[in-house]
Design a protein with these regions (language model features):
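RNA-binding accessory domains that recognize and position tRNA/RNA substrates
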Residues: 1-95, 99-100, 112
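Short, flexible helix/strand-to-coil boundary loops that buttress conserved ligand/catalytic motifs
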Residues: 12, 148, 189
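Active-site environment of divalent metal-dependent phosphoester hydrolases
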Residues: 72, 184-187
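Short histidine-centered beta-strand/loop micro-motifs
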Residues: 76, 177, 189
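Cysteine-nucleophile active-site neighborhood
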Residues: 104-179, 184
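Short, intrinsically disordered, charge-balanced linker/junction segments flanking boundaries
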Residues: 190-195
Length: 195
């Protein structure tokens, strides 16, 4: 067909964050009208977070997981370590978290742009981190950085899918991970932050 797919790939990669879509045969314009009328929410975390707290009992350390779009793998790993887990909604307050007297707090992964998460979440992180160790995964990590004055920026090319190599610098060991991320902490702002 004489289409240079390598050149197309390079153009898409170099252009930054591309628009995504699929080309399919459509018998009429009604499908396009529906697409134009679709409004995507910026409040993705509110859509996927648990509406009510729930326990994931264990006999070990007490851990609160703040659900920004929690994946079962996180709970599974905490259970393997016998942690006594309480999962709270994304909009839990610092007082609600601290009242549980946790040994640690996990800020879970989740969807979307961290800048759209309500500022009350950043305030909760600031208050809780003064009294309890925090661990952020994905979106939780980005929110932790924002709460402490670092900047979070879009990746030039998002990372989605499996088999992304990650090199552990100290041991020179390479592991492969599934990734789904569109943002990263701007490391040039970390030195000026509270991190």
């Amino acid at each position: 067909t004489n289409i240079d797919t390598r050149a197309i790939t390079h153009k898409l990669r170099d252009a930054g964050k591309p628009l995504k879509g699929s080309i399919v045969p459509v018998p009429d314009d009604h499908a396009f009208d529906q697409l134009h009328a679709t409004v995507l929410t910026n409040q993705q975390v509110a859509q996927v977070s648990t509406p009510k707290p729930y326990p994931n009992p264990g006999v070990g350390m007490s851990v609160v997981v703040v659900d920004f779009g929690l994946k079962n793998g996180i709970l599974r790993e905490l259970s393997r370590r016998k942690c006594n887990v309480t999962v709270l909604p994304y909009n839990a307050t610092a007082d609600e978290i601290l009242r549980l007297d946790p040994d640690g707090v996990v800020l879970s992964s989740g969807p979307g742009d961290p800048h759209y998460v309500k500022s009350a979440v950043l305030e909760m992180i600031r208050k809780v981190q003064e009294q309890v160790p925090l661990f952020g995964i994905g979106l939780g990590h980005e929110l932790f950085a924002l709460a402490n004055g670092a900047q979070v920026i879009p990746l030039g090319v998002e990372h989605h899918g499996m088999n992304h190599p990650i090199k552990e610098i100290i041991t020179d060991h390479i592991v492969y991970a599934n990734q789904s991320e569109g943002y990263t902490v701007d490391w040039s702002t970390v030195d000026r932050s509270k991190l």
